[in-house]
Amino acid sequence: MEYNVKDFGAKGDGKTDDTDAIQAAIDAAHKAGGGTVYLPSGEYRVSGGDEASDGALIIKSNVYIVGAGMGETVIKLVDGWDEKLTGIIRSANGEKTHDYGISDLTIDGNQDNTEGEVDGFYTGYIPGKNGADYNVTVERVEIREVSRYAFDPHEQTINLTIRDSVAHDNGKDGFVADFQIGAVFENNVSYNNGRHGFNIVTSSHDIVFTNNVAYGNGANGLVVQRGSEDRDFVYNVEIEGGSFHDNGQEGVLIKMSTDVTLQGAEIYGNGYAGVRVQGVEDVRILDNYIHDNAQSKANAEVIVESYDDRDGPSDDYYETQNVTVKGNTIVGSANSTYGIQERADGTDYTSIGNNSVSGTQRGIVQLSGTNSTFSGRSGDAYQFIDGSTGNDLLTGTPIADLIVGGSGNDTLSGDAGNDVLEGGAGSDRLTGGEGADIFRFTAVSDSYYTASSSVADQILDFDASNDRIDLTGLGFTGLGDGYGGTLAVLANSDGSRTYLRSYEKDADGRYFSLTLDGNFVGRLDDSNLVFRHKTIAGTEGDDSLTGNAMAEILDGGSGNDSLAGGLGNDVLRGGAGDDILNGGLGRDQLSGGEGADIFRFTSVADSYQNSGDNFSDLILDFDPGEDRIDLSGLGFSGLGDGHNGTLLLWTSSETNRTYLKNFDTDADGRRFEIALEGVFSDLSEKQLVFERLVLEGTRLGDQLSGTELNEELLGGAGRDILNGGAGDDILDGGSERDTLTGGSGADVFRFNATLDSFRNYDNGTSRVDDITDFTVGEDLIDLSALGYSGLGNGYDGTLAVLLNADGTKTYLKDRESDADGNHFEIALDGNYADQLSNGDFIFTNLEVIGSSSQAA
């Protein structure tokens, strides 16, 4: 039965206090055994009772309060209210209210015209007492402008559902789940609240949290936490889909909880980390798109750490155990230190695998736990760990690391993996750890003695059969007596240490000297001491040459070659032809040779200065009439004063060099800089590529071919053939059946609509695009505009992966059609049936936000 509040005297005129009239309708419905209390369109002013727990309106068992829609029916607190009010609408304190709910209305706390502490919607029995409310439903409700919590279901409530609702511009949290059991939060939006968007807290368990959105909140987008009391952990929480972005602190914080899954969400633009877990057990972070976080300060995109509550209510320290981070696509911002960082604070048994990580400043993964494991995707890079001007303690990970100490007396430890350790200036202690490690020295000043002092480095665990010492930057010719450009090998009296020494001093009175723990006399030779660059030579054709961790010479010869230097201090020579040169990390020397060459820089770490050292690359033969410098992956906007995303063009006739400099440091203190041999004061955007080039087709069938640069190819309408060529390209075929070839580089194949690539089984139409050269672990398929959540069975927003009978073509299929019977589908040449994972895609989950437009 329906009870219209206007039949009980409510005015809804925005002036009259309608509290008693609405409550009378609620009481009548309850007395009759239940019913619907209906509030037509209008603004209903309400006020509280004598006690905070009296609320303004007390909802009762079997009663449902229903309005005419968000923004149409508004229940608003009266002006001048200055008392605490625990719920504008709430269940009665201590009554075990059941089977009730609210829908299709707005609750307005009138924060600008009141002074009391006010909550919007409140449920529950009595905090700390046995008993509960149960079977509570909230649908299409907006709560705004309350001074405390908007939706505040409290201790204890069983079987709560809140869906398609909105909380915004409230003083604290938008949505709270405080000791909820068996709750569902679905398709809700929380924005511009003073603290958290969503807060699952106080022993809540068995929570399903689906397709919710939190943005612009003062603290975290979503928090799952025990809270400030010594209670049982929150447990069994399933977070599926949704997005958490542009919040002041973390996108998602999972703290003092257990058995939590975060899957299929997009998390970006937050002030601190994208995801932080603290003091947890059995947490799974799976198949999310986490990108461009750490907007306020340097942070990893995903942080796994323990939690110290010894000064808190439990007086305990909670070590994080058994966290799984798999299948995520992680892209860093300018402040993102690592993709995934496990802190060295007792955290252990973290399992990391099959993630796609790019764009971070210090490395992909940092692990510290003794029993933690990492398995990378093909194409994953090494970890770069950079020290400071002070005395650093730098520890690597289980994967391959490049660790550079800088100045100071540093201690470097590679851990597992095939690592490169470069102590830099100062007296350093170097431990390679497991794996075949390289100890690099680039100047006599890295390790030396003088007539009055010793600043020699010490290698603590050199393995003559696996490790190597890179001396290519010093000019020594080999072993000998320490004279004539040679190094002498000698041991101390008890054989516990071996010394590599030169007895010829440099202009500053320094003699190169290096100490190795152990006796290596007679065991050092060209297999473990590298004095000269190894040469990797190309052919007369078009070669693709890639260096490794050592200092090498890459010589392309004739042909249009692609040279990538790797980790060492390399020499790249393009030779004749139109070549692409990318030195990678290290102090590289680049020579394009004849032809129109491209010098590519993809990371600030490729060429930089910091407060302690210079790692700038040098281009030896730049030709401004033909050559170009590709900076499109770095985010610089153009030439300027070297600040605010610009590069300063600076020339020195004295040194006959030109410099491109940025003076703003990244999160690790690095300032991008490259040097060119010669004075080029007229360099402009003709030679400097700051943005990705766009090649655009027509309504007809086009054939677009990229170059060596990073380009965006847009086919438009028609049956197009797109070939990205070299470079990291974006290919978008548009409508009709297109053929897409990325070429070399890390390419993105983008689809913006179902009709870009589809099959219609009803009328037999096939407009399926074909990707000819997809590379797992390097290329990506961008479906972010289509709303798919991941790979699956082809239903409920997933794509099925299917293989044709002869194993030559792989299909991605949506088994559900649009209104016209069109099924989205893509074809990939080759067998990828057992290779593809969510990490090969850019997914954005559907954000079902109810009627938030009415609530704005």
Curated annotation (Swiss-Prot):
Q: Which reaction does it catalyse?
A: Eliminative cleavage of alginate to give oligosaccharides with 4-deoxy-alpha-L-erythro-hex-4-enuronosyl groups at their non-reducing ends and beta-D-mannuronate at their reducing end; [(1->4)-beta-D-mannuronosyl](n) = [alginate](n)
GO molecular function list: calcium ion binding; isomerase activity; poly(beta-D-mannuronate) lyase activity
Q: How is its activity regulated?
A: Inhibited by zinc.
Which pathway, metabolic or otherwise, does it act in? Glycan biosynthesis; alginate biosynthesis
Query: What are the alphabetically sorted keywords of the record?
Result: Alginate biosynthesis, Calcium, Isomerase, Lyase, Repeat, Secreted
Q: Which GO terms describe its cellular component?
A: extracellular space
Taxonomic superkingdom:
Bacteria
Location in the cell reads: Secreted
**Needed cofactors:** Ca(2+)
Task: Please name the SUPFAM superfamilies in this protein's record.
Answer: beta-Roll, Pectin lyase-like
Q: Where are the PbH1 repeats?
A: 133-155, 157-179, 180-202, 204-226, 234-256, 257-279, 280-304, 320-342
Query: GO biological process: any one?
Result: alginic acid biosynthetic process
Query: Positions of the Hemolysin-type calcium-binding repeats?
Result: 387-402, 404-421, 422-439, 538-549, 554-563, 565-581, 582-599, 715-731, 733-749
Give additional notes from the record. Each enzyme of this family of C5 epimerases introduces its own characteristic sequence distribution of G-blocks in their substrates, explaining the extensive sequence variability of alginates. These alginates of varying composition have different physical properties and are necessary at different stages of the bacterium life cycle.
Q: Which family does it belong to?
A: Belongs to the D-mannuronate C5-epimerase family.
**According to its record, what is known about the domains?**
Composed of one catalytically active A module and three R modules.
What is known about what this protein does? Converts beta-D-mannuronic acid (M) to alpha-L-guluronic acid (G). Has both epimerase and lyase activities. Contributes to abortive encystment by degrading the coat from inside the cyst. Important for cyst germination.
Instruction: Please state what the protein is called.
Output: Alginate lyase 7
Q: Which organism is it from?
A: Azotobacter vinelandii
Q: What is the lineage of its organism?
A: Bacteria, Pseudomonadati, Pseudomonadota, Gammaproteobacteria, Pseudomonadales
